[in-house]
Regions:
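Conserved S/T- and glycine-rich ATP-binding loop of Class I adenylate-forming
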Residues: 6, 37, 103, 109-112, ...
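A short helix-loop-beta submotif of the ANL/AMP-binding
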Residues: 1-14, 18-22, 27-36, 144-145, ...
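Conserved structural elements of the adenylate-forming
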Residues: 88-91, 100, 119-141, 149, ...
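Conserved pre-ATP/AMP-binding loop-to-beta segment of ANL
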Residues: 64, 69, 85-108, 115, ...
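Gly/Ser/Thr-rich phosphate-binding loop
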Residues: 167, 189-198, 206-282, 294, ...
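Structural core segment of the AMP-binding/adenylate-forming
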Residues: 8-83, 210
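Conserved AMP-binding/adenylation subdomain of ANL enzymes
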Residues: 127-145, 153-194
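Conserved ATP/PPi-binding loop(s) of AMP-dependent carboxylate-activating enzymes
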Residues: 281-318
C-alpha cells in the first residue's frame, strides 16, 4: 500500500531488504538519497542502530508504522497512522503529473558481487512487466487468488506477484514468511489458484511428506524462477499444477525470458536481441577472438548472456 501511495504522487519508493542491519542498511539508505524513511515497528531497532550514520536526521522524516501492539513509538520518529488521520482524502495535485517514464521505485540487487546496487525501475517497466506476466504468464482474471509469500522488496514478489495481481484485478494472499508445513492448508483455505515462486521455496515443498491438503488443491498455475528439473516433475505429477511459467531475468536487466508455451524444464523465449558468449569464470573475464570481438557459444556449453541495448530494450541503470 505504501509503495502504491508513493507511486501515485510521483515519489520514488526505495525498497530495502528488511533483514539488513548495520553497514549494508546504512549503505542502502544513503546511496539512494532518501529524504524520508517509513519503518515497521519490528525493524525500528535495526534502524536505530544506524541513525548516526545515515543522511536522514529530522524526527518528522522518520515515519513509524505500528504492526503490533507490542512495540512503542521511539522518540526519534513520528506515528505514521496519526499523520494519515490528519491527511485529506482528496487526490493531491501531483497525481496529475505522474508519467510512464518517471521512476517508480529503486529495487536493490542482492549484493552477491559487492554492495547492493539500486536498480532504477520506471513506471513503464513496472507496468509492462506486470501486464505481460499477467496476460502471457498466469492468464488469470478477477476470479483468481494468488499465494505470495515472497518479499515485496525484490522483483519476483513485487512484479511477478503483486503487480500482476493488480493488473488482473485478482486477489492475493500475502504472507510475511513462507512455511512449507502450512502452505497447502493456506492454498485450500484461501482457494489460491496461482503461485509466485522461487526455486528454493518449491524445493522445500517437494521435500515435505504428502498431506491431505495437497490433494485436489486449486493451484493451477505458477510463475517464478529457479525451479530445478526434478522439482518441476513433482509439481506437475504430485501436486497437479497444469501450467509452470519459468522466468529468467534480472531487476536491472533489459531482457526477460518466459516459458510461454508451458514446455517442461525450460526458461522459454525472449523478444530481445541476445547472445551467449564464452566466459572464463576462474579469471573473471570475457574470452575474445584475435580481432577483439567476443566469441559466441556454438554448442550447448554455458556462457555469459549479453543483451543488446536499444530504444526497445532499455537499460535504466542504477
Amino acid at each position: 500500500i505504501t509503495l502504491l501511495a508513493l507511486n501515485k504522487i510521483g515519489a520514488i519508493g526505495v525498497l530495502i531488504n528488511t533483514s539488513l542491519t548495520g553497514d549494508p542498511l546504512m549503505h542502502c539508505i544513503n546511496s539512494s538519497d532518501s529524504v524520508k524513511c517509513i519503518v515497521g515497528a519490528e525493524r525500528a531497532d535495526a534502524l536505530e542502530d544506524v541513525l548516526d550514520q545515515i543522511n536522514i536526521t529530522k524526527q518528522e522524516d522518520f515515519l513509524w508504522a505500528e504492526d503490533t501492539a507490542e512495540f512503542s513509538l521511539p522518540d526519534w520518529a513520528i506515528d505514521l497512522k496519526a499523520q494519515l488521520d490528519l491527511s485529506d482524502d482528496q487526490n493531491l495535485e501531483e497525481t496529475n503529473s505522474v508519467k510512464a517514464k518517471d521512476v517508480a521505485c529503486y529495487i536493490f540487487t542482492s549484493g552477491t558481487t559487492g554492495v547492493p546496487k539500486a536498480a532504477i525501475c520506471p513506471n513503464q517497466k513496472l507496468m509492462a512487466a506486470s501486464i505481460n506476466i499477467k496476460m502471457a504468464g498466469y492468464r488469470i482474471d478477477e476470479t483468481d487468488c494468488m499465494h505470495n509469500s515472497l518479499p515485496l522488496y525484490h522483483s519476483t514478489g513485487l512484479m511477478l506477484g503483486l503487480c500482476a495481481v493488480i493488473q488482473a484485478g485478482a486477489s492475493t494472499f500475502i504472507k510475511r514468511k513462507f512455511s512449507a508445513s502450512s502452505f497447502w492448508d493456506e492454498v485450500q483455505q484461501y482457494n489460491t489458484t496461482a503461485l509466485v515462486y522461487i526455486g528454493e521455496l518449491c524445493r522445500y515443498l517437494a521435500n515435505t511428506e504428502p498431506t491431505q491438503a495437497e490433494q485436489n488443491n486449486p493451484l493451477k498455475v505458477m510463475v517464478g524462477n529457479g525451479l530445478r528439473p526434478d522439482v518441476w516433475d513433482i509439481f506437475k505429477d504430485r501436486f497437479g499444477v497444469d501450467r509452470i511459467v519459468e522466468i529468467y531475468g534480472a531487476s536491472e536487466g533489459n531482457a526477460l525470458f518466459m516459458n510461454l508455451l508451458n514446455k517442461d524444464k525450460t526458461i522459454g523465449m525472449t523478444n530481445a536481441q541476445v547472445a551467449l558468449i564464452e566466459y572464463d569464470v576462474a579469471e573473471d573475464k570475457i574470452i575474445k577472438n584475435d580481432d577483439g570481438t567476443c566469441k559466441k557459444i556454438t554448442t550447448h556449453d554455458p556462457g555469459l548472456l549479453i543483451v543488446f541495448i536499444s530504444p526497445n530494450s532499455v537499460f535504466n541503470g542504477y
